[in-house]
Amino acid sequence: MKENRITRLVKQDKKLLIAYYMPEFPVPGATLPVLEALQESGVDLIELGMPYSDPIGDGSVIQDAAHKAISHGVHVGSIFELVRRARNGEGCKKITTPILLMGYCNPLIAYGGDCFMADAVKAGVDGLLIPDLPPEESEDFLERAKHFGLSVIYLISPVTPPDRIELIDSMSTDFSYCLAVNATTGTGKLDVAGMDEKIAEYLKRVRQHTKKKFVVGFGIKDRERVRKMWELADGAVVGSALLQHVATAKTPEETAELAAGFWKSLR
């Protein structure tokens, strides 16, 4: 079995800049041009959202994007097809960037666990982040993911106790994902303009109780915030800000152009 692209990525001595994108947002046909634009603009890893009608942990930006994606016919199978086309260079330049799917348990269960993982790997997916799947209840899931060669990422929050941080670190395949605030995504409550002491202390605590790398997301909108998160973590995730930036696009080409311009501004 070939080494997972995410595993290869985290072995590099670099700070990561990770994009979260909802497929076919804001217009049908936007996904492949956006993936190409992000890759050409220096993205390190791409999280693709799996839209769900009741995304409890997501803020209004991602909820709206999910509803629009669903209205454009996006479902698990269509995401696999988009990833397959991206990997084969059909409709865009060949995408070699690691791809992580992020979404809730229900669509995965409805598809069928092993079938989901087999089809994900066949399409070219590298990893999974399932926010509503607690590590304590996911030993079988983790074992099956390992069997299929998928990286699994778990979430850490500011209220996660040290012993649970250590558990999450041990169970995450390559890195953990830290929520910067105890809030829904994209709320913009992350006070990194003044480098909030609580966030700094929280991420220092995570560092003390982890052996693997960890990235931080939620509320990161510009180059200054990316840089400040890089000082405390191994990577920064930008999602809601990217979706907001492309939301007014009327065509796939305009979406890709806006995505590229925004992403270059973060570097």
Curated annotation (Swiss-Prot):
Lineage top rank: taxon: Bacteria
Catalytic activity entry: (1S,2R)-1-C-(indol-3-yl)glycerol 3-phosphate + L-serine = D-glyceraldehyde 3-phosphate + L-tryptophan + H2O
Pathway: Amino-acid biosynthesis; L-tryptophan biosynthesis; L-tryptophan from chorismate: step 5/5
Transmembrane feature ranges: none
Residues at the active site: E47 (proton acceptor), D58 (proton acceptor)
Enzyme class: lyase
InterPro entries, A to Z: Aldolase_TIM, RibuloseP-bd_barrel, Trp_synthase_alpha_AS, Trp_synthase_suA
GO MF annotation list: tryptophan synthase activity
Keyword Ribonucleoprotein part of the UniProt annotation: no
Keywords on record: Amino-acid biosynthesis, Aromatic amino acid biosynthesis, Lyase, Tryptophan biosynthesis
GO CC annotation, single: cytosol
This enzyme's EC code(s): 4.2.1.20
Keyword presence, DNA repair: no
Stated family: Belongs to the TrpA family.
Complexes and interactors: Tetramer of two alpha and two beta chains.
Biological function: The alpha subunit is responsible for the aldol cleavage of indoleglycerol phosphate to indole and glyceraldehyde 3-phosphate.
Matches recorded under PANTHER family: TRYPTOPHAN SYNTHASE ALPHA CHAIN, CHLOROPLASTIC, TRYPTOPHAN SYNTHASE, ALPHA CHAIN
Designated name of the protein: Tryptophan synthase alpha chain
Gene it is expressed from: trpA
